[in-house]
Amino acid sequence: MIFSTLEHIFTHISFSIVSIVIIIHLITLLGNEIIKPYDSSEKGMIVTFLCLTGLLITRWIYSGHFPLSDLYESLIFLSWSFSLIHIVPYFKIRKNYLTEITASSTIFTQGFATSGLLTEIRKPTILVPALQSEWLIMHVSMMILSYAALLCGSLLSVALLVITFRKIFYSYKSNNFLKLNESFSFGEIQYKNERNNILKKNYFLSAKNYYKAQLIQQLDYWSYRVISLGFIFLTIGILSGAVWANEAWGSYWSWDPKETWAFITWIVFAIYLHIRTNKNFQGANSAIVATLGFLIIWICYFGVNLLGIGLHSYGSFTLTSS
């Protein structure tokens, strides 16, 4: 009873704090000079991380096994992973481009985990025989950590694409307006006035364009490094899973739906890392591959569980309303 109460307290405290953190981050987006609210939000994420850690430890003691046996527990661990990725760079770089991504991801995953849709699987249960192994911690934790890192890196790539294509669109729109005035000959004086107005506008926006260029460069930088970290975790997770599968089922690989999509995920991000080594494909080109990887991860992690088939069917679930 006491462990259930502690779990309930940790869940609500962490969710409340991360909700406040999101609001603070939205406020700080209005200006880079607002430092105090930003520092408060970072301290809030540290408290959230500690609460999620307490939640996992409490559930571990309460259930008698490491909390990675079902979707609810994996979502809590995923939230913990997002908060970990959030606070680790904070001690080295006070402000980076991961903060908004990780904070939003934390509240999204934890909000879904604690919603009424997963009420049936929220109560701890006895592990099925296939999960009663020391490999559970190694394999599943590496896979969830890889999902967290790859999702963060992919979202940074999505942000890079949005900024890049908006920049191209506005540049194309401005150039077409100049050509339209010139071709229809509204008069030399009127044309020159319109042209000068646009040039002045572009001049005043040059600083903004420079900032966008720097932002795109930083997004590409962080995306590459976070995805590289996630790829390492994914590789370790797949290899440890293969060893565990051989011990449990007598085969390293059986092309189970979960295994197949994990392999597809690995291939997609291997392609990303490969083309990223070519300077001509850095930026938007490699970001397109990472964006595709974002969709693949959700299919691998969440979509396959909806099927409820294969050797990983113990992780399946049904959505219910409270």
From Swiss-Prot:
Protein keywords: Chloroplast, Cytochrome c-type biogenesis, Membrane, Plastid, Thylakoid, Transmembrane, Transmembrane helix
InterPro entries per record: Cyt_c_assembly, Cyt_c_biogenesis_CcsA, Cyt_c_biogenesis_CcsA/CcmC
Subcellular location: Plastid, Chloroplast thylakoid membrane
Cellular compartments per GO CC: chloroplast thylakoid membrane
An individual GO BP term: cytochrome complex assembly
GO molecular function terms attached to this record: heme binding
Membrane topology note: Multi-pass membrane protein
Superkingdom as given in the UniProt entry: Eukaryota
Segments passing through the bilayer: 9-29, 44-64, 71-91, 143-163, 226-246, 255-275, 287-307
Function summary: Required during biogenesis of c-type cytochromes (cytochrome c6 and cytochrome f) at the step of heme attachment.
Family, similarity comment: Belongs to the CcmF/CycK/Ccl1/NrfE/CcsA family.
Subunit record text: May interact with Ccs1.
Classification via HAMAP family: CytC_CcsA
Name of protein: Cytochrome c biogenesis protein CcsA
Species the sequence originates in: Lactuca sativa (Garden lettuce)
